[in-house]
Swiss-Prot record:
Residues of the active site: 400
Family of the protein in this entry: Belongs to the class I-like SAM-binding methyltransferase superfamily. RNA M5U methyltransferase family. RlmD subfamily.
Organism: Shewanella woodyi (strain ATCC 51908 / MS32)
Record-listed [4Fe-4S] cluster binding positions: 83, 89, 92, 171
GO molecular function: 4 iron, 4 sulfur cluster binding; iron ion binding; RNA binding; rRNA (uridine-C5-)-methyltransferase activity
Gene: rlmD
GO biological process: rRNA base methylation
Annotated protein name in UniProt: 23S rRNA (uracil(1939)-C(5))-methyltransferase RlmD
Binding residue positions for S-adenosyl-L-methionine: 277, 306, 311, 327, 354, 374
Catalytic reactions on record: uridine(1939) in 23S rRNA + S-adenosyl-L-methionine = 5-methyluridine(1939) in 23S rRNA + S-adenosyl-L-homocysteine + H(+)
Function: Catalyzes the formation of 5-methyl-uridine at position 1939 (m5U1939) in 23S rRNA.
Listed Gene3D superfamilies: 2.40.50.1070, Nucleic acid-binding proteins, Vaccinia Virus protein VP39
Tagged with keyword Methyltransferase: yes
NCBIfam families: PRK13168.1 (NF009639), rumA (TIGR00479)
Length: 443
C-alpha cells in the first residue's frame, strides 16, 4: 500500500505564532515558565509576574520554547543589566534579575530539585556562601573566530546555545585586571600574521600575576612572537603560547607556574588547562566550610575523590589525618603531588584513577572515616556504587549541578545516610549556575 507524506497541520504557523503569556516562575536554568494550550512554555529573559509577547520557536509533545519579543509588564525585581553585551553574549543569563532574588531563586531551585529527584529534605538549610557580584572571575577562556571575508579575528564569548563568537570589549564579571585586557588583546591578535591559526585565549589572575595563554594550532613566526612579547611587557602580564599537543612556550613569565594560596600557607600551582575554581573568594570560603563540616581528626583516614590539584586534599591534610586524593587526569595528579611537597604536607597520597570504571582492584579502595566528593557536572554515581567498601561516617558532597547531586543522593540514602546540611555556594553570580554543598552522615 502506498504511503504519502502528510504535513503536520499548521506546524509552521504555530512556530511563527506570537502570543501574550503570563510568567509564573523560573526553572532551575533561569528561564521563565508560562502556560499555553495546556503545555509548559520556557522563555529566557523573563521574570515571574511579567506578561510578555513571545514567539514560539520549538514545539514538543509536553512543552514548547519561545523567545521574548517585548515585555508588556515589568517585575519589580527586574534590574538593568550592567554588561553592554548582555543580550548577545551567552556568558551570563540572570543580570536582569536583582542579586537578592537570584540567590533566593537558586536556593529554592536547589531545595526543589533535591525533594523532587531524591525525595529527601535537609535537616538544616545553611546560609549560602556568597561574595562579590561583579569582577569575581579570576579565570576565563575566550573563544576566537577568524572571518575569511574580512581577514579579522573576533575575540569573545559564544552566544547562548550557539557557536557564534560575540565580539566583546569588556566583561563585568571578570577580574578588572582581566577585563581591561580584552580590547588591547583583540587588537593584538588582529596584528598577528598567524591569526587564523589561533584557538582560544585563556586569561588568569592569581597570586603571582596575570597570565594570558594563547592557543595556537601551528608555530608562530618570530615577528608574531615579538609582538606578543611587546604586548606582555606593555601590559605587565605573563604570556604563554600553548601548542597543539599542549606544549607551552613562555614568551614572558616567571619560572614558576600560576598559583593561588589557601590559609596563607597552602600553595596550589596549576598549569593552563588544569581545573581550578574560577571564583577565588568563594573557593576559600567553600574549602573552609568543607573542612569544618567533616571535622577531621588526626587519627582518621580521609578520601577525596575528584581531587584535582589538591584544593580540598591539602587543607584536610593540615589536620594530621591520612588523606588520599584520587583524580582522573594524570597531569593534575602529578601537580597535586608537587603541591603537597611544596606545602610540606607528607600525610597525603595521590592516585590516578578513572572514577567511572571498575574500582575493585584499586589499592586505595577500603574503609575510610570521612569522604569528600567534588565531581564534574556528570556527578559521582559510578563511584558511589563502591560505598560499601568505604563506609565513611560522614560525606561532604560539593556539587556544580544540583540535578546530579539529587540523583547521587539516592544510593547514599539507601545505605543509611541522612542529609544533615545543605547550602548554596554562589560561585557564579549573574548566571543561573547553581553550586551546592551537602553533608551526609551515617545514621
Amino acid at each position: 500500500m502506498a504511503q504519502f507524506f502528510k504535513a503536520k497541520p499548521n506546524s509552521s504557523k504555530q512556530l511563527s505564532a506570537k502570543v501574550s503569556l503570563q510568567v509564573t516562575r523560573l526553572d532551575h536554568l533561569g528561564a521563565g515558565i508560562a502556560q499555553h494550550n495546556g503545555k509548559v512554555v520556557f522563555i529566557p529573559g523573563v521574570l515571574p509576574g511579567e506578561k510578555a509577547m513571545v514567539q514560539l520557536t520549538e514545539q514538543k509533545k509536553r512543552y514548547s520554547r519561545a523567545k521574548l519579543l517585548n515585555l508588556e509588564t515589568h517585575s519589580i525585581d527586574r534590574v538593568e543589566p550592567k554588561c553592554a553585551h548582555y543580550h548577545q553574549c551567552g556568558g551570563c543569563d540572570l543580570q536582569h534579575l536583582s542579586l537578592e532574588k537570584q540567590r533566593l531563586h537558586k536556593e529554592s531551585a536547589l531545595v526543589s530539585l533535591m525533594a523532587k529527584l531524591s525525595h529527601t529534605e535537609a535537616e538544616a538549610l545553611v546560609p549560602a556562601i556568597i561574595g562579590e557580584q561583579w569582577h569575581y572571575r579570576r579565570r576565563a577562556r575566550l573563544a576566537t573566530f577568524y572571518h575569511q571575508e574580512t581577514k579579522r579575528t573576533t575575540l569573545g564569548f559564544r552566544a547562548q546555545s550557539s557557536k557564534e563568537v560575540i565580539d566583546i570589549s569588556s566583561c563585568p564579571v571578570l577580574a578588572k585586571s582581566l577585563s581591561e585586557l580584552i580590547s588591547p588583546l583583540s587588537k593584538l591578535l588582529n596584528q598577528l600574521a598567524s591569526r587564523r591559526a589561533l584557538g582560544h585565549v585563556e586569561l588568569i589572575d592569581v597570586d603571582n600575576g596575570q597570565f594570558v595563554v594563547v592557543r595556537a594550532t601551528k608555530e608562530l613566526s618570530d615577528k608574531d612572537k615579538e609582538k606578543l612579547l611587546s604586548f606582555a611587557q606593555e601590559h605587565k602580564v605573563n604570556l604563554i603560547v600553548q601548542g597543539n599537543e599542549g606544549e607551552l612556550l613562555v614568551i614572558k613569565g616567571p619560572k614558576e607556574l600560576p598559583f593561588y594560596t589557601l590559609n596563607s600557607d597552602i600553595k596550589l600551582s596549576f598549569t593552563p588547562g588544569n581545573f581550578v575554581q574560577v571564583n577565588g573568594e568563594i573557593n576559600r570560603a567553600m574549602v573552609d566550610q568543607a573542612v569544618q563540616w567533616l571535622d577531621v581528626k588526626a587519627d582518621e583516614r580521609v578520601l577525596d575523590l575528584f581531587c584535582g590539584v589538591g584544593n580540598f586534599s591539602l587543607p584536610l591534610a593540615k589536620s594530621g589525618a591520612e588523606v588520599i586524593g584520587v583524580e582522573g587526569v594524570p597531569e593534575m595528579v602529578a601537580q597535586a603531588r608537587i603541591n603537597a611537597k611544596q606545602s610540606d604536607l607528607s600525610d597525603v597520597t595521590f592516585f590516578h584513577t578513572d572514577l567511572s570504571a571498575d574500582l575493585s582492584k584499586e589499592p586505595w579502595l577500603g574503609k575510610v572515616d570521612k569522604l569528600l566528593l567534588d565531581p564534574a557536572r556528570a556527578g559521582a554515581f559510578e563511584s558511589l556504587q563502591w560505598l560499601k567498601k568505604m563506609k565513611p561516617k560522614s560525606i561532604v558532597y560539593v556539587s556544580c549541578d544540583p540535578s546530579s547531586l539529587a540523583r547521587d543522593s539516592e544510593p547514599l540514602l539507601k545505605h543509611g545516610y541522612k542529609l544533615k546540611k545543605l547550602g548554596l555556594v554562589d560561585m557564579f553570580p549573574q548566571t543561573h549556575h547553581i553550586e551546592a554543598m551537602a553533608l551526609f552522615e551515617l545514621s
